[in-house]
Amino acid sequence: MTNMWTLLLLPFFAMLQVHYAWCWSPQDRVLLRDIQTITLYADRYTNARRSAPVPQLKCIGGNAGCHAMVPQVVQCHNRGWDGLDVQWECRVDMDNSYRFGKVEVSCEGFDFPEDPYVLRGSCGLEYTLELTEEGRKRTQDGYRSAGFGSGYFQSNSQSWDSKTDGSSAIVLIFIVILAYGVYKLFLSGPSVQQHPRPDEYGYDHQSQTHSSAPPPGFKSDFTGFSSGYGTGHVNQGPGFWTGLGTGGVLGYLFGNRRAQPYQSPYFNTWTGPSHSESMHQNDRPPQSSGVRTASGFGGTKRR
């Protein structure tokens, strides 16, 4: 009976061996200490045999945040054996605001996790992303100047409100002065100095060039006769010229205000905040000083 089961299972084990040999050749089983360099990419996964594939580059934390900077290509070099495992130096072109924190190369053991042989192409990098001194300064300056959120809009709204209040007061004063000038110029009646009025008989006193006594029974006010009749005229002195000058000045001022482009301080959902460049050039955090090749050092983790 035992021999029968052995005969039945023998083809099955033979098929497993053939499948194993076909899928994983001896070249896929490499000694970890012999690996000198590995190049890892952000958009690729590792090879896997006993476990699931993992990303070749994986951020696991850090005070900069994993989304602050995503390296596209990292190259790790074998820097020697410490008696326990391989030590690595991983290098990447990185903004001066960031640096590697903890780095650890993770490889899949070929037959078991602690196997000194690993599956070729199964190594990936786990790292933390930290802020440099420059990065911390840029972050602090950015929070102070922009507010990052409601503080940003609140501070700009307050400054705009104060500017609006001041300009509204000036405009109101201008409007009052303009209204007064218009009233004096057009609405108030001209002052008449001893202007004669024609009498009820239709007699035109303007044809006379000298004064004479009024007829008996008539008052001198009615007939318009007076000693100063010949010099009577409408007063168009300081009131007229003051109103005219005020209107001209106000027209010039309002014309200049209309000629200046309007710039709203509020957020535009299509283009972002619509402040002018001059309003923000002193509020922006300092720009990065550049990019350099950053290095991180760490050991090996098996899986």
UniProtKB/Swiss-Prot annotation:
Topology of the protein relative to the lipid bilayer: Single-pass type I membrane protein
UniProt keyword annotation of Metal-binding present: no
Keyword Transferase attached: no
Localization in the cell: Endoplasmic reticulum membrane
Transmembrane segment boundaries: 169-189
GO cellular component: endoplasmic reticulum membrane; endoplasmic reticulum-plasma membrane contact site
Cited InterPro entries: SARAF
Signal sequence extent: 1-23
Biased composition (Polar residues): 265-276
Family statement: Belongs to the SARAF family.
Protein name: Store-operated calcium entry-associated regulatory factor
Source species: Xenopus laevis (African clawed frog)
